[in-house]
Every structure is written in structure tokens, then in C-alpha cells.
A protein has these predicted regions:
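Active-site rim helix/loop that mediates acceptor-substrate recognition in acyltransferases
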Residues: 1-17
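Portal/gating segments that form or line small-molecule/metal binding sites
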Residues: 6, 28-36, 45-48, 62
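Short hydrophobic/aromatic beta-strand or adjacent loop that forms the aromatic wall/cage
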Residues: 11, 104-108
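Conserved beta-strand in the GNAT
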Residues: 13-15, 21-31, 42, 47
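Active-site beta-strand termini and strand-to-loop segments that position acidic
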Residues: 17-19, 111-113
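Conserved acetyl-CoA-binding loop-helix of GNAT-fold acetyltransferases
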Residues: 45-48, 54-67, 79
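Conserved active-site alpha-helix within GNAT-family acetyltransferase domains
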Residues: 71, 75, 81-105
Length: 113
């Protein structure tokens, strides 16, 4: 498995690739689906193909994204989610509830990197 990233001005995508197939993705974004311009960078868009779930791919993608953010001079990252208990195992702590542009409530997590 290999991990790669592309460079964009407002977001940087990361992909987990096996045998030339993308099996997982994550992004570092300057902004996300929330009216919170003072909070960034976001680790978001985390997805792993169902057949590869349970193999710690998302953990590796998040770690890779955090290392990239750290190299860029950031000391923390944020993850928005509806899940409870998922990102805590990756070192994130619950910061509070946030409301997205669709007026839906999500949980905001932060991690010192």
C-alpha cells in the first residue's frame, strides 16, 4: 500500500492506494462545511472502501494528513463528525457541537500535532 498527496491551494487530498486502486481518501482543508473561518486546518472527507475497513487505513490517512499539517506549521487539526468514540482513539478530543451550513449539528474534535 502506498500513500500519496496532491497539492491544492484550499485543500490537499491524500489517497491510500493498493495495486493502483484508490481504497481510501482524506483531505486537509482550510475550510469545511461550517461557518467557522477561524478554525483550520480540517481533516475531513475521510473515506475507506468497505472491503478495506478494519485495516486501520483511516488511521493511517489521518496520521499522514496530520504530519503534512505539522510540516506546514500547524500545531493542531480539527475533525467534524457525527460519530462518537471514533476519533478519540486517534488522539482527538471532543471540543463541542457545531452547526453546518445545512443547519445540522455535528461534533467537533481537535488534536494537538
Amino acid at each position: 500500500m502506498s500513500f500519496g498527496h496532491g497539492r491544492l491551494q484550499t485543500e490537499t487530498p491524500f489517497a491510500a492506494i493498493i495495486n493502483g486502486r484508490i481504497i481510501g481518501i482524506a483531505y486537509i482543508r482550510k475550510s469545511d462545511y461550517y461557518p467557522l473561518p477561524e478554525i483550520y486546518p480540517w481533516v475531513s472527507g475521510i473515506f475507506v472502501t468497505e472491503s478495506y475497513r478494519g485495516h486501520r487505513i483511516s488511521e493511517k490517512l489521518i496520521s499522514f494528513a496530520n504530519e503534512y499539517a505539522k510540516e506546514k506549521g500547524f500545531d493542531k487539526t480539527y475533525i467534524p463528525s457525527v460519530h462518537t468514540g471514533l476519533y478519540e482513539k486517534y488522539g482527538y478530543r471532543y471540543l463541542g457541537d457545531i452547526v453546518n451550513y445545512a443547519n445540522e449539528t455535528d461534533r467537533l474534535y481537535v488534536k494537538e500535532i
